[in-house]
Amino acid sequence: MGHIMRPLKQYLPCLALPLFVAIADEPCRAQDASDVAKVIVPFVEKHCVDCHGEKKQKGDLSLHLFKDEAAILKGRKTWNRVLEQLATGEMPPSKRPKPAFNEAERFTEAVKSVFVRFDRTAKRDPGLVTMRRLNKVEYVSTIRDLLGVSIPLAEDFPADQMGHGFDNIGDILTLSPLQLERYLASAESIVKAAIVTGDVRDLPKQSFGGSQQFEGTKYGQKYDDRGRIARDDKGKQIPEKERLPALSGDSSRLFYDKGPLHKRYNDLLVAGDYRIIAKLQGHFVGDEAPKFALLADGKEVLQGVCTEKAEEYSATVRLKAGPVDLGVSLLNEFTDPADPTKRRGIILHSLTILGPTVKESQEILFAGSEKLEGDAKTRFVLERFATRAYRRPVTKDELERLMRFVQQAGKISHYRLSAESFQKLHAAKLPGDVAGRLKPMEKDPFTDEDRFVKSIRQRIKDDEFKNHFPTILDAAEKSPQPWETRIGLAVRAVLCSPSFLFRVELDSRPTEREAHPIGDYQLASRLSYFLWNTMPDQELFDLAARQQLHQNLPAQVKRMVADPRSKALFDSFAMQWLGLRRLQEFTPDPKLMPDFSRLQARGNWTDLRNDMLTETGLFFTELVRENHSILDLIDARFTYINRRLSLLYDIGDTNGNSGLPKARPINPAGKPIPDIQILERGQDSGTFARSVNPFVRVNLENTRRGGLFTQASVLTITSHPTRTSPVKRGHWMLERILGTPPPPPPPNVPSLEGQKDAARLPLRQQLESHRKNPNCAGCHARIDPLGFAFENFDLLGRFRETDGDTPIDASTEMSNGRKVNGPEEMKAIVRGEKELFSRNLTEKMLVYATGRGLDYYDVRTVNGIVAELQKGDYRFHALITAIVQSDAFRMRRGKEQP
């Protein structure tokens, strides 16, 4: 052990001490519980409690209550922090007497021995499972896979709270009155979207446009609905009196300008999936074919390339009931420099909307019931649906209650749902004081004919009915509703059930102290929400039904990460782990934005921000699917860029024609990708659609980039809106990558922005002035060098040699005296910290996978996962497989602590 402490700073890793590794894996001399009283407590009282005791708690650290092993074990994170600061020499502070080397070494071994002894002898503890509500993302994706309904259901939902860095933590995913209200309203909307029971019609073909002919011209530019000036093909403005009206019928219209040609259609009778067909023909000028986007209510639903002949292009899109605005937009406008009268354009012959088409949701819901009739059909549909919705076999009692929804529909007009009726209906108690805070609805939100709980009378005797439900407005008998409508009532009841809204893990041994495996259905849910953020698919259900999922976890991991739905690991895990959601709130100084119009590329900050996230998402998703090393996150020789990013990075050519050697698109096997195969992300999870501004996989050899640290998404969230921030970048690397965040800054220390006298100095000198404060120097010695190494990248990720008139200095010196120059050398140092990085990533992913924070007893589990990761050459599949095979993931225990 002496090599760790002698001398205190010289032999330490340059970033931080991997304390978990040292505690867990290094041999320690024999210790016993008496060392707490003989060694640990006296050392703390002598060197620590004056600043971290009952009277003072500097840095929010108090050590005076740690009097025995049990207290020390529960404060494991605190003691890791104590040992780290002792080893680095940060504590005791310079003004306090330092402990002798032998004294500090004995104290360190005594603390470590407490944890080593526990890790080697304690019973396995998978942690306590908390029943948790589906968060917004899980809810929407589950509805999508359960019913095929893809509408933004969660827009009006309150934001999910975060704990331990993620929004899927069970302890905070409770049910508030507002959320309950939203779920009830959403259930009604979902059923209306999933089951079409009204009249369905195909809207007739409606063409709009009109070829406009002028003397000496073939076409004049359109004068669209937004009032753009109409010009003839010689560029001259057309006088109002000479403009010809658009012709009706099947005539066409040629347009050149950026604005879309659009048409407001009549109200759609029902929401649903509609087919939009555009008949288009290209007007060719220049080397490229005209490229178009098909629009529905202002959103792109299809992109494509026109030919010289008129052809039909179609897309199926979900539309809401009511009016809809359809249009076509030219994406690559071009004017011949030699002849301004020649402009690229598109001829729109017709635009047609048909629908709703046969709904996927009804195919999903009613699949297999085509040959059944009556109650047999109803029972089959409900049993299959409820089993999938509850992620487990539906019980006999549950099924009978659902059957009564269908059989008794129409007996009661409607009632206002109350907290009491919700609890009575689902035989469930609302958590906390939710029921007490719910107010009776003053206005019934449901229609008289369509009650999702009409069978409530069947669960209560008639004499009790009036007493239990005084809010019933009308009990008039009504004629039976259509079968689809009555099925819809039961579906709504399922979607409001706690068994659907919560991830409930039923256990036949809920109070058993010993750890035991969870059921296969529960394991299927844990696996699918971890890797896909949605419900299990049929293969997982089948394995669970045969009780074979526990034995097939490695094969399922391999299958599931190859599935497009595994993109959820980026969208929900990596986005939160890396802090990338903050990019949605970031707005740079407009003066610092690139002029894309000057660079002949379309886009604004929103477009560029989305491009940044797409690059990181495609990069991370490939690492997972193709089983790369986790170390490639730090430095890799490829990334994904589109035209805007190629111009921003000056990195290669996706029609950006930038200055560096052209970076040709390659696939994961290293082979070039033909342009026709270049793909861009689509709207659904994990799929990619053809695009005129495609993302391509490019080789980064001989460039200045590679890995997360040089991607615009990371460089931007670690900057200020007006400048870079070495402090934010260094802090991000310590916290997000290495898992060794510095403590919060001391109170009453002015921020860098608050130091007016230093504002006129270059950034490096401003920080040097800031570090003169002794309260700041220690932490900034760790933070700042990491950020300074990346100063060549500006706040948007562009490479630069100067900051204004000041040359960039990317050289720096680590806290251990090691000199580093630039991003490549710093990435090599960070990549060398395999233990720190792999342990931090393991801990973060385990928190996300289990939906709970880690505790002192989880260190043994983490150690085992890290060991498997090392054996697997640090590959992603090794990490994920080790997590799903760990006790924390596939086992549970009762509420009492073992």
Named regions from a protein language model:
Residues 7-8, 26-28:
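Intrinsic low-complexity/disordered segments
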Residues 11-25:
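Bacterial N-terminal signal peptides
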Residues 2-3, 21, 314, 685:
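A detector of low-complexity, intrinsically disordered, Ser/Thr/Gly/Pro/Ala-rich segments
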Residues 3-4, 22, 446, 860:
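Intrinsically disordered/low-complexity terminal segments and short unstructured peptides
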Residues 1-10:
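N-terminal secretory signal peptides that target proteins for export/translocation
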Residues 28-59, 74-898:
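Low-complexity, glycine/serine/threonine/alanine-rich intrinsically disordered linker
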